[in-house]
Amino acid sequence: MNKKKNQYNGWELKFFDKSKNFRNYQMSLIKKYLGDHIAEIGPGNGTNLSYYYDHPKKIDLYEPTKKLYLNLKKKFKDSKKVNFFNKKLSLKKKNYNSILYLDVLEHIKEDEKEIIKAYRSLKKNGSLIINVPAFSHLYSEFDKDVGHHKRY
């Protein structure tokens, strides 16, 4: 569990790693929108990356949680096309074909500002791909414990 308030540590990610059918389905819907240069925001332990790795030519991973960032660097250390950033998305003018927020936006308190920043970082006709937990009325202690600010 998350022992310290406001410090996300990703303890629940190992459970979501096992959702292979869901991840395969999700990737079948979004792969055609990825393009050659993508950014994934909050990739956690890299589960999603494993499903789309072969598609783009260049991948930038923005993981602000130090422990998860270090694990990502170790897991994909031999990759020539993955760049790692231990921070939130930096505004990069028209740099990406797509930006992924897969089960991440709910962790960002100022989500609207984040979406604007991401949009400004997309190339013309780029894709902003977002997956979030639905049904705000289901917001629970679990959401709080895993660092969710809200459901949508």
Identify what each model region corresponds to.
Residues 1-102, 112-115:
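Conserved N-terminal segment of class I S-adenosyl-L-methionine
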Residues 47, 68, 108, 125, ...:
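Feature marks short, surface-exposed loop/turn motifs that line or immediately flank catalytic pockets
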Residues 59, 128-129:
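A short hydrophobic/small-residue beta-strand
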Residues 103-107:
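A short His-aromatic
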Residues 112-127:
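A short glycine-rich, Lys/Arg-flanked "PGG" loop and its adjoining helix->strand segment in the class I
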Residues 129-152:
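Short, glycine-/aromatic-enriched active-site segment of Class I SAM-dependent methyltransferases
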